[in-house]
């Protein structure tokens, strides 16, 4: 196949930009995950209250 000059390949990707975007997305997802996990573990000193299931409610 002969490539026609003056036309750009529509499937050419700037892999450095794609890689940097992926790394930024992965870092943000990791940080959000840590925040979610730590926010459930530390409740600012609040004691956990367990719900009691009434025996007749089953």
UniProtKB/Swiss-Prot annotation:
According to the UniProt entry, its GO molecular function terms are: sodium channel regulator activity
Q: Which UniProt keywords apply?
A: Ion transport, Membrane, Potassium, Potassium transport, Sodium, Sodium transport, Sodium/potassium transport, Transmembrane, Transmembrane helix, Transport
**What processes does the entry annotate via GO biological process terms?**
positive regulation of sodium ion export across plasma membrane; potassium ion transport; sodium ion transport
What is its membrane topology?
A: Single-pass type III membrane protein
Its domain of life?
A: Eukaryota
Q: Tell me which GO cellular component terms the UniProt record holds.
A: membrane
Similarity-based family? Belongs to the FXYD family.
The UniProt function text for this chain reads: May be involved in forming the receptor site for cardiac glycoside binding or may modulate the transport function of the sodium ATPase.
Protein name per the record: Sodium/potassium-transporting ATPase subunit gamma
Which species is this record about?
Answer: Bos taurus (Bovine)
Lineage in the entry? Eukaryota, Metazoa, Chordata, Craniata, Vertebrata
Name of the gene: FXYD2
